[in-house]
């Protein structure tokens, strides 16, 4: 199962494999405190896209599309497919630090990863 979680929420066993998807390391956390298994800053939005978006909900739809195009352009599909495959076998949690829990890169990235799953593998 693929899920998302703010880094400021306590880690739990249910998180499974935790992947930090922020380009910048979250303030106030050591690597031990973050309890992440991977830091995939290469999957985060570019600095220019992140700054343009600025977590403005009015820009959300366009941000999602630009971010998807960025991932395609940077040939990240195989990396995202690997995450989707892992999420079929175990819990995978995309960890983020944004305050807005509805309009952030982890939400958009989860949507992209879920769209890559072959039909018939959706969770019930």
Residue ranges of each PLM-predicted region?
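Residues lining hydrophobic/aromatic ligand-binding pockets adjacent to catalytic sites
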Residues: 1-124
């Amino acid at each position: 199962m693929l899920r998302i979680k703010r880094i400021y929420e306590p880690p739990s066993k249910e998180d499974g494999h935790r992947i930090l998807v922020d380009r910048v390391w979250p303030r106030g956390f050591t690597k031990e405190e973050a309890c992440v298994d991977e830091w995939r800053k290469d999957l985060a939005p570019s600095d220019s896209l992140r700054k343009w978006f600025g977590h403005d909900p009015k820009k959300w739809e366009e941000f999602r599309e630009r971010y998807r195009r960025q991932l395609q352009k940077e040939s990240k599909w195989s990396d995202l497919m690997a995450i989707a495959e892992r999420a079929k076998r175990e819990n995978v949690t995309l960890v983020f630090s944004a305050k807005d829990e509805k309009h952030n890169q982890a939400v958009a990235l989860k949507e992209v990863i879920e769209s890559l799953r072959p039909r018939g593998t959706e969770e019930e």
